[in-house]
Amino acid sequence: MSELTPMMRQYLEIKADHPDSILFFRLGDFYEMFLDDAVKASRILDITLTSRGKGGDGADVPLCGVPYHSAAPYIAKLIEAGEKVAICEQVEDPKTTKGIVKRQVVKVVTPGLVVESESLSPKENNFLLSLFDGNNGRWGVAYLDISTGEFRLTEVEGHDAAWGEVACANPREILVPASFRENMRGEGRGDLAAGRTFTYVDDWVYDRDYTERLIKNHFGVASPGALGCDGYAEGLQAAAAVLHYLQETQKGRVDHIRELRAYRTQEFLVLDEATRRNLELTATLSEGKRRGSLLGLLDRTATAMGGRKLRQWINYPLVIVEKIKERQDAVGELANDPALRAGIREALEGVYDLERLNGRISLASSGAKDLVALKASLQRIPPLLSLLESTGTALLGELCKGIDPMDEVAELIGRGIVDDPPFVLREGGIIADGYHAELDELRAISREGKGFIARLEAKEKARTGITSLKIRYNKVFGYYIEVTKTNLGSIPEDYIRRQTLANAERFITPELKEYEEKVLGAEERIVELEYSLFQQIRQSVAAEGERLARTADRLATLDVLASLADVAHERNYCRPGIDDGDTLSISEGRHPVVEALNVSERFVPNDVLLDNGENQLVIITGPNMAGKSTFMRQVALIVLMAQLGSFVPATEARIGVVDRIFTRVGASDNLARGQSTFMVEMMETAAILRNATPKSLVVLDEIGRGTSTFDGVSIAWAVAEYLHDTARCAAKTLFATHYHELTELAVTRGKIKNCNVAVKEWNDQVIFLRKIVEGGASHSYGIQVARLAGLPIEVIERAKEILHNLEKGEYVEGGVPRISRGKRAAAPKSSPQLSLFEQGDDLLRQRLTGLNIAALTPLEALNILDELKRMV
């Protein structure tokens, strides 16, 4: 250590306090990285890795660096790679410091704590989430978006429900107790853990006394109950870990975290991880894209905060009928008033992301352009309020009352900040003329400088008679008078020599020196004063953060309502009836996304009736590609849309509010967790049977297909019986299957109905009619579907042959079908039932073929039938 330079010793001391972060160490105009940080960062950032001496034992020290004024994109790239970055600044002026400059970490940027807009997706939250297992079956979940100040907590029962909240929040970073490090990956969902940064917090942070003290101190309350968080012990422990982490990384600059909202999952329609994925609520299954999801369809929002609010509504549909109807009323009024919708959109399109502007202003990381954007946004509010004054629905009226134009804030910014300020704060040009008297005076001095120099130069030329005399400036000598050597004899006595050149000499005069001190001092003072004034304005705006947050939330809500109204009007959706009953009735329902994407083909609508009586469980049979999965997803999506307050794609709908939607649709191996397709399927089915209630909606597609036929039929049959017979989980259920044996359940169970997807056979082809009709399907048409998929003709013909053998019902020991392995017999071209007689029955055949059936009387027909009977 003694061989290290003082600077490297300082670096290593600071680095020791931040071992899990890449340390950006400020050296002049650069952030430097050393040792392992340099090696890692140079690889991620694709920048040059170099080295220099004076490391331990005299070894070379790997290093790389980036300019401090353009560090943001480099930091963003490291964060995107899952790294944390500790920003270490010089906290002393090198000009006035002897020895090593004092440095300290001013903040740590982590994947879950990003505030720079360039690194954030506009219409998605960037959550830091905290999980805490109370070891009593209850899990605390808390999550924060530092860029907006949104901070929420809840408690759930069990591991699966906790990870369901993780799936909903979709955090970039997850905090867990350090003692949970070893089993975090095993206990967690592999697919949910992928791509997220895990941070392990010291166990003592979760101590309940410390938790309560931290919560009370931050929010300035006497007890957590003042925040509405009574009865959330584990949730508060999770939230305290977030606050502790903020203190460690943000160095206390989190004043904009002013509210902690507790919620019960029972207040919303519960959607587990599998259901969110299978229904493609916010991203498609195949590509993970927004387009093709329900969010992609419904999002017509004009603001980023509106887009985030819509995502929240989709993730948390309502279960309280009055609140749903309140939203429906507002959507209906907007849908029926195109002029009002257009006016709202025009106003909102000029509104910036107020939530994130508020966050940056409160964190003192905003620039002058952020304040100008805030002013422009606030100026859009008065005309918007004029539009809303005439609205008649309760929710729109509440929004109108709650949106604050904050006139004095807009006036302060307009008076204090120029309309087009520079990006860099410390270069001046930010504060408007007329805002501050001293600044105006200093600017006058600076602006008059050129005129003063020109006048002084003319005066000196006249006084000395030296026509070639020049007054110039450089950074080393400041202002000076330059005289050629041929004119040195004409210089006055008050000229003071400053520099001798080959062909000239440079001088100053007392008058020029006095001007220099005044002008240069003025320019330095201008920059210093402007920055100070800007900070004062920013602090004044930050003090109104709560008002701004409330206004932003109401504008976001208005934006979502207008977006839903746009879609409802354009796509001819209906307002569904909502009640607390048990009936789910949809007339001519359509799949919202499929209908919108396939504009060239008319979507075939379908009806559905489910209740807790004789229509509790509907078994749906029919071939692949016929539309079973689309139909079932469409029912689930219509229910979800109705409960988030949207209109729905149907001619009429009545929705008895459901408490949960479960889907078991499709499957794939989860290699990260060592689980097969069948295991994933069975785990999801088990979760449904454990958690479903009579108020739930269950969608099951092809239960049991991941194992042998007999096992699959048995499991599917037993699951259907359980959902029917067990009162605790007798949910309204759509059950699609290829096992036609299950249609027999409608005979033995009073609340089971059979439906199938209609098809039409024509010229050995199958035509899918996409219509759900009563009754079970008679065929699966799998071979026809295989032909449509392009399987080789040899495979198709062999499949027909095997199917023919299987339909004979021949099985070997153990239930395995007997399939001929010898020379292939040609697959029959027609069903064997079409030939009623053997070829040797010539007399019988001749008698039948000679009959003119159309000419027979009933009596003649009976006599001939008796004759034929005697011939057999």
From Swiss-Prot:
Q: Name one GO biological process term.
A: mismatch repair
A family per Pfam: MutS_V
Q: What InterPro entries does this protein map onto?
A: DNA_mismatch_repair_MutS, DNA_mismatch_repair_MutS-lik_N, DNA_mismatch_repair_MutS/MSH, DNA_mismatch_repair_MutS_C, DNA_mismatch_repair_MutS_clamp, DNA_mismatch_repair_MutS_core, DNA_mismatch_repair_MutS_N, DNA_mismatch_repair_MutS_sf
How is this protein annotated for GO cellular component?
A: cytosol
Ordered alphabetically, the record's keywords are: ATP-binding, DNA damage, DNA repair, DNA-binding, Nucleotide-binding
The record's family statement is: Belongs to the DNA mismatch repair MutS family.
**Do you know which HAMAP family this protein is assigned to?**
MutS
The UniProt entry, under NCBIfam families, shows: mutS1, PRK05399.1
This chain belongs to the protein called: DNA mismatch repair protein MutS
Per the UniProt entry, what species is this protein from, by scientific name?
Geobacter metallireducens (strain ATCC 53774 / DSM 7210 / GS-15)
